[in-house]
Regions:
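DNA major-groove recognition helices of helix-turn-helix
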Residues: 163-164, 180, 203, 207
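Protein kinase-like catalytic domain
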Residues: 69, 118, 168, 204-208
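N-terminal/domain-start alpha-helical segments
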Residues: 1-125
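Short, Lys/Arg-enriched segments at the junction into DNA-binding effector domains
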Residues: 2-3, 116-174, 178
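Conserved micro-motifs of the catalytic ATP-binding
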Residues: 188-191
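DNA-binding patch around the recognition helix
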Residues: 130, 155, 200, 204-229
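Short coil-to-helix segment of the ABC ATPase nucleotide-binding domain corresponding to the Q-loop/switch region
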Residues: 108, 173-184
């Protein structure tokens, strides 16, 4: 059974989330503080997705997200944000989250986002016949879901991996934000297009020699992005 960490300090919200995730067939691990969540991750290595509230009584959800990313880049992370806090969404994505859900949210929206994230993190994928994509100086191993630049490993989240894979398999092709969203997040994802832009910004910091002057992931103004100038 797929295991999810639920970090939420308000017990009624946490119970609502847990009940609906269990109804959808997921196993849950609960935490009410950031430190408790980090401890649960160490005790439960089978956790593949984490739902993180931002406002917590000890360390906030952003710091928990940073620490999770330092421990494991393969865990999918969804931030639970207030609808009015636009900067929380951007900050969460830049600290390593894969997605966000704004409060209040419906059970269908929450479970849909979780299901889509499990799919993107590779749990439901079959191994591919061609296990390497090479675009110098990059080498993408689709079997291990890893990226190297000049022989050095680049640490990617699973969403970042999906974006790089899409670009490297379509070199020189302009891809719209909508195409990227559909390919990486899935056609059933109904989030905002800005999630593409924020993930591209984060990805450039990791793979470009100068993120302010990108040469690998370039902008196609008014449309989207492409691999190469």
């Amino acid at each position: 059974m797929k295991k999810i960490l639920v970090l939420e300090d308000e017990e009624n919200i946490r119970s609502f989330v847990v009940i609906n995730l269990k109804r959808a067939g997921y196993e849950t691990v609960e935490a009410g503080t950031g430190e408790e969540a980090l401890a649960q991750l160490k005790q439960n290595p089978g956790i593949r997705v984490a739902l993180l509230d931002i406002m917590l009584p000890d360390i906030d959800g952003f710091e928990v997200c940073r620490r999770i990313r330092a421990m494991d880049n393969k865990i999918g992370i969804i931030m639970l944000t207030a609808r009015t806090q636009e900067m929380d969404k951007v900050t969460g994505l830049m600290t390593g989250a894969d997605d966000y859900v704004t409060k209040p949210f419906s059970p269908a929206e929450l479970t849909g986002r979780v299901h889509a994230l499990f799919r993107r993190t590779g749990g439901d994928e079959e191994l591919e016949a061609d296990d390497e994509v090479v675009q110098p100086p990059f080498r993408l191993n689709t079997r291990n879901r890893t990226l190297e630049k000049n022989g050095q490993r680049v640490k990617l989240t699973q969403v970042e991996y999906g974006i790089v894979k899409l670009f490297m398999e379509n070199p020189g092709k302009a891809l719209s934000r909508e195409e990227i969203l559909d390919a990486v997040w899935g056609r059933d994802y109904f989030g905002e297009l800005k999630i593409v832009d924020v993930n591209i910004r984060r990805l450039r910091i990791k793979i470009e020699d100068d993120a302010t002057n990108p040469v690998y992931i370039t902008t196609v103004w008014g449309y989207g992005y492409k691999w190469g100038g």
